[in-house]
Regions:
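General small-molecule cofactor/ligand-binding pocket signal
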Residues: 38, 76-80, 131
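Gly/Ser-rich helix-loop-strand patches that form or flank binding pockets
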Residues: 93-136
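Short glycine/serine/threonine/alanine-rich loop segments
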Residues: 33-34, 73, 97, 128
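Small/aliphatic-rich secondary-structure junction motif
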Residues: 2-51
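Short, hinge-like loop/turn segments at secondary-structure boundaries
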Residues: 52-56, 118-120
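Conserved hydrophobic residues forming the short capping helix/wall of the S-adenosyl-L-methionine
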Residues: 28, 61-69, 92
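Structural beta-alpha unit
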Residues: 2, 69-100, 106, 120
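Short, solvent-exposed loop/turn segments at secondary-structure boundaries
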Residues: 48-52, 112-115
C-alpha cells in the first residue's frame, strides 16, 4: 500500500455537511499524513465566499469538526482562485500530494445532465489517486 504523506482535501465552504472532512481528517491521522485543506474560489461561478483566506478557512474547520480530530495532526490551510479542478491539480503537483480527497453529493440525473460537478471535474483532471467520500 502507498504511503500517503501528503493528502489534499478539497473543501467546499458552501456545504454544511461535514461527513467528508471528518473522514479526511481521520484518514490523515490513520496514516500520520500532512493534510492540505484547500478551498478554491471559482470566479466563473460568480460568487466569492467570504472565508476564502487561509485563516478564515482554518477557523471554519475548527468550528465545524471535533477538536480531538485536529490534535497532533499536521494541517495546512490554503486558498486559491480559478477553475476548481485546475487549481486543485496544480496545488497537488506543487506540493507533492499523494492523494486527493473530495466529498460527493448524489444528484439526480437531470441535475447531473444540466450542471457540472466539481468532484467529477477533479477526478477527470487529476493524474493521481482521488478518493471520493459520499456525503450523507
Amino acid at each position: 500500500m502507498n504511503a500517503y504523506r501528503n493528502i489534499l482535501y478539497a473543501i467546499n465552504l458552501n456545504d454544511e455537511n461535514i461527513t467528508s472532512i471528518i473522514y479526511a481528517l481521520e484518514f490523515a491521522k490513520l496514516f500520520s499524513s500532512r493534510i492540505h485543506i484547500v478551498y478554491v474560489n471559482d470566479p466563473q461561478a460568480g460568487y466569492r465566499h467570504p472565508t476564502d483566506r487561509e485563516d478564515a478557512i482554518a477557523l471554519r474547520v475548527r468550528e465545524t469538526v471535533p477538536e480531538s480530530l485536529l490534535e497532533n495532526l499536521d494541517v495546512v490551510y490554503a486558498a486559491s482562485k480559478g477553475n476548481i479542478a485546475e487549481e486543485i491539480v496544480r496545488y497537488a503537483q506543487d506540493y507533492q500530494i499523494d492523494l486527493i480527497m473530495v466529498g460527493h453529493k448524489h444528484r439526480s440525473r437531470l441535475y447531473t445532465a444540466l450542471f457540472d460537478s466539481d468532484d467529477v471535474s477533479i477526478i477527470d483532471t487529476a493524474l493521481l489517486p482521488v478518493l471520493v467520500i459520499p456525503e450523507k
